[in-house]
Amino acid sequence: SQSAWMASIEIYIDVAMAAQSEFIVFSPGRWGQQFFHKEKGVPLNRICMVSNFMGFALDHLKQKTSLEKNKVLILAGHPAKLAKVIDGHWNTHSSKSPSALPTILKAVENIFPEITQMELQASKTVEHLIQTSEKNHTSKVLFAAVAEKISQAVSKYLENRMPVEVLLADFKGNLIGRAITHD
């Protein structure tokens, strides 16, 4: 049930906050969890699976009086899920929030020349956008900008109480974007 899942998210977060670690990791799902485990070598049980409930998980995290500047919140996953928070969609389930594609395209609309922008706008899905941006060599800049917008949105949601790092990956498990906010 949803309430049981949300209770498990609270437990994941409580355990992660109690751990003697410089970071806490949120991932929307198993895919992001596996990616982060591979990227950083962090044990799978140390990665908080927050599913579609990013806002709920962040609210639980905010309740912790021990939010410290020396602990970093890391979000790891696919931009199709994580970029939804840029526009304030904190429940990222497809029935509760729109596709992240328009949000991503809007976030980078002034970065590239018009011809490149038109190529990117032709994408049908976020994964298609990733492939298109890799072909025209704009992927690094595009997804660094998206990761930056995500980290800023989450940092603002947390009232700048802790640094936020974002690691974005494609479905092949390749790191495609990274950003960190410091406050």
Question: Where are the model-predicted features located?
Answer:
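N-terminal loops that bind phosphate or other acidic moieties
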Residues: S1-K71, K81-L82, I86-D183
